[in-house]
């Protein structure tokens, strides 16, 4: 979700009660990742949820971790940062992670919140990481979006 025109919503803690949530976070860009993780964990705490945090080396590893965790969790959230460099590596990583996470969600039926920042500069990532002075909190948004999706599917009987 983009900051401009983003919907305003908050999941209902009573409806979210008992959801098993996993947060998978890459380790690159420590300060930014700390902000994303804190935002996702705060959103979970606001809902009375205690997510399991799994750390993986990099953003590419988020996909396999999400696939395995989707076997036993109701909601999975992936968090990472990919900053554009001078080589096509950025494009390969962003495409593979986006496709992989989407495939995990569609194949398993488990909502996977996408909190992977794909940015041109580290400052753009900091602006979205929920750090002091940030304009956005993509960690919180990713967790809330995944929880809201799971709740909508349950209401629909899916």
Curated annotation (Swiss-Prot):
Its EC number is 2.5.1.78. Keywords: Riboflavin biosynthesis, Transferase. The active site is at 89 (proton donor). The keyword Mitochondrion does not apply. (2S)-2-hydroxy-3-oxobutyl phosphate binds at residues 86-87, 128. InterPro entries: LS (IPR034964), LS/RS (IPR002180), LS/RS_sf (IPR036467). Disulfide bonds: none annotated. 5-amino-6-(D-ribitylamino)uracil binds at residues 28, 59-61, 81-83, 114. It is an enzyme of class 2 (transferase). GO terms for cellular component: cytosol; riboflavin synthase complex. CDD domains: Lumazine_synthase-I. Pfam families: DMRL_synthase. It catalyses: (2S)-2-hydroxy-3-oxobutyl phosphate + 5-amino-6-(D-ribitylamino)uracil = 6,7-dimethyl-8-(1-D-ribityl)lumazine + phosphate + 2 H2O + H(+). Pathway: Cofactor biosynthesis; riboflavin biosynthesis; riboflavin from 2-hydroxy-3-oxobutyl phosphate and 5-amino-6-(D-ribitylamino)uracil: step 1/2. The keyword Acetylation does not apply. GO terms for biological process: riboflavin biosynthetic process. Catalyzes the formation of 6,7-dimethyl-8-ribityllumazine by condensation of 5-amino-6-(D-ribitylamino)uracil with 3,4-dihydroxy-2-butanone 4-phosphate. This is the penultimate step in the biosynthesis of riboflavin. HAMAP family: Lumazine_synth. NCBIfam families: lumazine-synth. Belongs to the DMRL synthase family. PANTHER family: 6,7-DIMETHYL-8-RIBITYLLUMAZINE SYNTHASE, 6,7-DIMETHYL-8-RIBITYLLUMAZINE SYNTHASE DMRL SYNTHASE LUMAZINE SYNTHASE. This is 6,7-dimethyl-8-ribityllumazine synthase. It comes from Micrococcus luteus (strain ATCC 4698 / DSM 20030 / JCM 1464 / CCM 169 / CCUG 5858 / IAM 1056 / NBRC 3333 / NCIMB 9278 / NCTC 2665 / VKM Ac-2230) (Micrococcus lysodeikticus).
């Amino acid at each position: 979700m983009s900051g401009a025109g983003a919907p305003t919503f908050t999941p209902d803690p009573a409806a979210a009660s008992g959801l098993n949530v996993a947060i998978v976070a890459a380790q690159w860009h420590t300060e930014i990742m700390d902000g994303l993780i804190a935002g996702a964990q705060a959103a979970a705490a606001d809902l009375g949820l205690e997510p399991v945090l799994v750390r993986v080396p990099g953003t590419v590893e988020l996909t396999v971790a999400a696939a395995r965790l989707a076997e036993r969790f109701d909601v999975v959230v992936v968090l990472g940062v990919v900053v554009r460099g001078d080589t096509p590596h950025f494009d390969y990583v962003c495409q593979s992670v986006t496709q992989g996470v989407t495939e995990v969600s569609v194949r398993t039926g488990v909502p996977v919140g996408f909190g992977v920042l794909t940015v041109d500069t580290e400052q753009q990532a900091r602006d979205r990481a929920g750090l002091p002075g940030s304009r956005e909190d993509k960690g919180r948004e990713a967790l809330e979006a995944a929880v809201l999706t799971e709740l909508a599917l349950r209401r629909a009987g899916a």
